[in-house]
């Protein structure tokens, strides 16, 4: 973005006897970051101009001039030729001044019945609506990658963990589908947030509305808003829709951070469950052997960044009286960075999941080391009539003996198993295999391979 400086004059300078100092100008200017709203600002202005003509406030000639001038400005902005000026403070006054320079008095009439307060609120909602649509597409791409990988590994057994200790056998596909469900809820939250974002604040003016005979519903239709903000004070003063988005974004990043932690662990030699494609890793400047999972590590780190933006927005709003205050200028940078970080993370993640190489033998070996079928033995005893708490105690003693002798439960001979409970029969060995343990959980939401394949089919239908 290029900026220039012009003699001090502005949309409000007539009230003041001296120009704003240079340091205050730099301190208060938002153009270094709100220039990103330019295309949305032009969209809102064109709809506002069309409405002013519709209600008889703006002539057909002025409307045509505004449309032509805005078209030229849009081309300049997209081509990077627009000269942004700190003296014009923000994106709104920069565009208005440039428009007026092109078309004369018609440009000065554009702001009739409008304030920068409702103008910026409209711009942010247009920006965020577009961002949510892109993020929803990114979530869908990530979910698709998860489903594809889960389908390929519906039968691949791995240890399920609690407290990062081997707990029970699950399939890798089942594990991946847990993240599919988390992202599905994230998508629901984003879509629900979009409904509240998609309300038109324009027409609220500074805070009390306007004396011009405006038609807010007309502008809403022009811009694709589902409804109009019903209270002018609320329309310009609150940013709860941005906070809600930031909260939903923080949850998405939290879910991806958890998956990132697992990818990092699984890629480590101590686990060796997976490998990531080289394009998502880096090396060491001193240790030639290193292949570091930088992308998932950065996802973990950037999650803290997004969480921080949520807190910043909450803190920004908590002490403001109605209506608009300059504090709200500080909403844009955390919002923009949250959108950028989340959109980039989703795009990278969808591709990274497609590049995961799974190592089933390592997963199988790991699940054999932690008595993962102990719960199956307890369930077996319960089905034989033993109360669960007694069954739990029996199996715990059997695990201790097996552990001390370096054996698995399935390696204990029947006569030794019967010393712990005489009701154990030789049919128990079918349940103490990994395959038997998985197959036993053949219900909706369970980890049996048949259920995982059915869940994959349902997931594809939801995408």
Swiss-Prot record:
InterPro entries: Arg_succ_lyase_C, Argininosuccinate_lyase, Fumarase/histidase_N, Fumarate_lyase_CS, Fumarate_lyase_fam, Fumarate_lyase_N, L-Aspartase-like. This is Argininosuccinate lyase. Its EC number is 4.3.2.1. It comes from Thiobacillus denitrificans (strain ATCC 25259 / T1). The keyword Kinase does not apply. It is found in: Cytoplasm. Its main location: cytoplasm. The gene is argH. GO terms for cellular component: cytosol. The lineage of its organism: Bacteria, Pseudomonadati, Pseudomonadota, Betaproteobacteria, Nitrosomonadales. Keywords: Amino-acid biosynthesis, Arginine biosynthesis, Cytoplasm, Lyase. Belongs to the lyase 1 family. Argininosuccinate lyase subfamily. It catalyses: 2-(N(omega)-L-arginino)succinate = fumarate + L-arginine. GO terms for biological process: arginine biosynthetic process via ornithine; L-arginine biosynthetic process. SUPFAM superfamilies: L-aspartase-like. It holds the Pfam family Lyase_1. Pathway: Amino-acid biosynthesis; L-arginine biosynthesis; L-arginine from L-ornithine and carbamoyl phosphate: step 3/3. HAMAP family: Arg_succ_lyase (MF_00006).
């Amino acid at each position: 973005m290029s900026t220039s400086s012009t003699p001090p004059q502005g949309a409000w300078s007539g009230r003041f006897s001296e120009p704003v100092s240079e340091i205050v100008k730099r301190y208060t200017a938002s153009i270094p970051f709100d220039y990103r709203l330019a295309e949305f600002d032009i969209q809102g202005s064109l709809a506002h101009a069309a409405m002013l003509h519709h209600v008889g406030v703006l002539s057909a000639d002025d409307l045509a001039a505004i449309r032509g001038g805005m078209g030229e400005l849009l081309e300049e902005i997209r081509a990077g030729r627009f000269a942004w000026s700190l003296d014009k403070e923000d994106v709104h006054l920069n565009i208005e001044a440039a428009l007026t320079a092109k078309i004369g008095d018609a440009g000065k009439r554009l702001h009739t019945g409008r304030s920068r307060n409702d103008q910026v609120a409209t711009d942010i909602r247009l920006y965020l609506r577009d961002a949510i649509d892109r993020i929803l597409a990114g979530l869908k791409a990530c979910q698709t990658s998860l489903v594809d990988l889960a389908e390929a590994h519906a039968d691949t057994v791995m240890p399920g963990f609690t407290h990062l200790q081997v707990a029970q056998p699950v399939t890798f596909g089942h594990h991946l589908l847990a993240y599919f469900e988390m992202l599905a809820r994230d998508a629901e939250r984003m879509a629900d947030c979009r409904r509240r974002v998609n309300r038109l604040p324009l027409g609220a003016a500074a805070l009390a509305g306007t004396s011009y005979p405006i038609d807010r519903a007309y502008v809403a239709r022009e811009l694709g808003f589902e409804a109009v903000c019903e209270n002018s004070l609320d329309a310009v003063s609150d940013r709860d829709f941005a906070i809600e988005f930031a909260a939903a974004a923080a949850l998405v990043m939290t879910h991806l951070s958890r998956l990132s932690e697992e990818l990092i662990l699984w890629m480590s030699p101590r686990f060796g469950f997976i490998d990531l494609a080289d394009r998502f890793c880096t090396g060491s400047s001193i240790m030639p052997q290193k292949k570091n999972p930088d992308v998932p590590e950065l996802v973990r780190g950037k999650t803290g960044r997004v969480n921080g933006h949520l807190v910043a927005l909450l803190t920004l709003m908590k002490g403001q009286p109605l209506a608009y205050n300059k504090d709200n200028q500080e909403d844009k940078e955390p919002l923009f960075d949250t959108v950028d970080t989340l959109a980039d993370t989703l795009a990278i993640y969808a591709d990274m999941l497609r590049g995961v190489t799974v190592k089933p033998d390592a997963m199988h070996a790991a699940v054999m080391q932690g008595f993962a079928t102990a719960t199956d033995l307890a369930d077996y005893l319960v089905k034989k009539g033993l109360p669960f708490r007694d069954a739990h105690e029996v199996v715990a003693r059997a695990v201790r003996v097996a552990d001390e002798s370096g054996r698995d439960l399935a390696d204990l001979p029947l006569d030794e198993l019967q010393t712990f409970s005489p009701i154990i029969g030789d049919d128990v060995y079918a349940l103490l295999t990994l395959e038997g343990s998985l197959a036993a959980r053949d219900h909706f939401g369970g980890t049996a391979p048949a259920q995982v394949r059915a869940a994959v089919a349902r997931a594809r239908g939801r995408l």
